[in-house]
């Protein structure tokens, strides 16, 4: 068995190679690799991916996403675990351990983990290199009936109820849509407009909202990169996407980049991610004054596009949405888990939902 590692240049060469094109399974999709290559926080020497091969057969891989955090007044390079997969046929051959310890040897003191399978939490913590798992509490508001997805599709023994459940969802959502026609029109005090120009004024804005310490650093280039190099492409699964274990295509995927203006002055920013009718507030930079108008904007977008849920980890926004009780069906508390190296003094409370690779998935 052979483990290959790839930095930025090597990753570019790999995805253009005949070897990559001939693999039955690939360790990274082409467009996801391009995103890694263009990451503004990625240095030429950063190892981004480790892949294990048995002859010409891919049997496992692990990858990271470089980032920058500010802790104790110092910018520090960090690496978010972004993918980890081992072929079922090789899970008894220590492939996972070989891959993960290749990663640990290089980035032990700078590794961050989020969006992990709960069953792996104890395994990570047994290494003794991480702070106790931290959690951020968020809120999810279901805005359409989706019993089929929430219950039937997840519980195999209830699959016989799927046709009836789909019919019920469609009928109830039709009723809910008709009711929405009679909603009272809102009046916004601020101007919120879609804009993906990340210039010097934008940089000044987000700098004013980022804390002086204990946060994941972002600048204009990061947001341009996120929108320019998505990990998920909109469309049906194809031959290429079936070669990759993780998601690379989705029936609906896109971003909505919104700037907030008060008296023609840029005063806030919000980045929304929409995937398969689910809206997530990935980044939010604004004062309390704008929260009411932002909630109106989000709820109007949900109504116009018939989206099924809203997820936010900004308590101010969640509290404002909660006031509009007739605009959603069920509220639910959700949590996001973070495992952070002991070597960097940072807490999860400074993270935004989109930090790490969440904004891409």
For each of these PLM feature ranges, what is it?
Residues 3-6, 11-54, 59, 132-274:
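Amide-forming acyltransferase catalytic core, primarily the GNAT-like/NAT-type
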Residues 45, 74, 96, 113-117, ...:
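Active-site-proximal structural scaffolding
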Residues 83-88, 283-284:
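Short, basic, glycine/proline-bearing loop/turn elements
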Residues 86, 91-106, 289-301:
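Conserved acetyl-CoA-binding loop-helix of GNAT-fold acetyltransferases
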């Amino acid at each position: 068995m052979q483990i290959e590692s790839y930095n930025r240049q090597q990753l570019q060469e790999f995805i253009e190679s005949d070897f990559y094109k001939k693999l039955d399974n690939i360790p990274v999709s082409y467009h996801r690799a391009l995103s890694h290559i263009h990451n503004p926080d990625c240095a030429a020497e950063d190892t981004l991916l480790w892949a294990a091969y048995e002859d010409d057969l891919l049997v496992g891989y692990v990858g990271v996403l470089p980032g920058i955090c500010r802790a104790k007044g110092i910018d520090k390079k960090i690496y978010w675990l972004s993918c980890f997969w081992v072929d079922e046929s090789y899970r008894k051959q220590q492939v996972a351990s070989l891959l993960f310890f290749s990663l640990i040897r290089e980035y032990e003191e700078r590794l961050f983990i989020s969006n992990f399978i709960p069953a792996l939490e104890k395994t990570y913590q047994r290494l003794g290199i991480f702070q106790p798992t931290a959690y951020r509490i968020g809120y999810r508001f279901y805005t359409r009936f989706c019993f089929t997805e929430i219950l039937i599709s997840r519980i195999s023994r209830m699959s016989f109820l799927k046709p009836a459940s789909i019919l019920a969802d469609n009928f109830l959502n039709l009723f809910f849509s008709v009711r929405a026609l009679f909603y009272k029109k809102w009046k916004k005090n601020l101007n919120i407009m879609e804009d993906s120009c990340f210039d010097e004024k934008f940089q000044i804005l987000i700098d004013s909202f980022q804390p002086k310490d204990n946060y994941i650093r972002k600048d204009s280039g990061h947001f341009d990169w996120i929108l320019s190099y998505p990990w998920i492409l909109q469309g049906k699964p194809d031959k290429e996407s079936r070669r990759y274990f993780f998601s690379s295509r989705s029936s609906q995927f896109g971003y909505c980049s919104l700037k907030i203006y008060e008296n023609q002055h840029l005063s806030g920013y919000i980045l929304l991610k929409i995937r398969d009718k689910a809206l997530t507030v990935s980044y939010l930079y604004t004062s309390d004054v704008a929260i009411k108008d932002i909630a109106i904007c989000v709820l109007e977008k949900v109504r116009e596009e018939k989206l099924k849920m809203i997820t936010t980890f900004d308590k101010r926004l969640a509290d404002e949405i909660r006031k509009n009780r007739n605009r959603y069906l069920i509220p639910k508390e959700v949590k996001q888990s973070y495992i952070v190296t002991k070597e960097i003094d940072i807490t999860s409370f400074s993270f935004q939902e989109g930090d790490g690779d969440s904004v891409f998935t």
